[in-house]
Amino acid sequence: ICVTMYHVPVLLEESVSGLNIDPDGVYLDLTFGGGGHSREILKRLKDGCLIGFDQDSDALANVPDDSRFIFVNHNFRYLRNFLRYCGYDEADGILADLGVSSHEFDEAGRGFSFRFDAELDMRMNQRSRLKATDILNTYSEEDLTRIFRNYGEVDNVRRLVDLIVKARTEKMITRSEEFLQVIAPCVPKQKEKKYLAQVYQALRIEVNGELEALEDMLKEAERALRPGGRLVVITYPSLEDRIVKNFLTRGHFEGEGEKEFSGHVK
């Protein structure tokens, strides 16, 4: 594992500048990955501290040898607990670059991509138990329908679920190639890649509890930031994007009461 296997950080200058870094401040990089954002933050720190989070153990190989940096190999939803554990009550700035890392997509054995035949794993935290294959083989029809509709926004969800349930009664679905063969009859022509991306996204989100973790993170970030502190979140058009924009523009998630927190979306 090496840094070059991870993507070059997007919006590097814009996101780090958005933190308005105090050289002696305390900062959190919630999506450490290859360490690109963290290295740029460290360049701008003097006696400050940077705490980097990543639940994927592969990221350990990219941790910089710098006394100002602390690495936390856990989900960012627990950021306040670890901030206190590291000896700080609040942070001056928090950065998160959401989504799956290119490293995870490109590691064939992790099962994140339909480009490779591999076990349907999809765990970001390799110590967790639930895998995509568990979902496909044990979830009820109702739960399968829920995740593919809500997390994948799949149009023909009933047909998709019927094919999965029928196939698993004959043989467990464990690998990508098997799964693609099972669902082939319901994959729209000329839209194969988009459809498969939606299906895989739904499984990945369920395996990793991504949306719940994101909501927890945003609530924790609100409480962890000092007055005047900054939260910078990089998102792409997605379910995550909607959650973040609701929180930053309205100070709450849909269906929740107002909170004394607001921000700007660019």
Kindly give the residue locations of the regions a language model identified:
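S-adenosyl-L-methionine-dependent methyltransferase catalytic core, i.e., the SAM/SAH-binding region
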Residues: 2-266
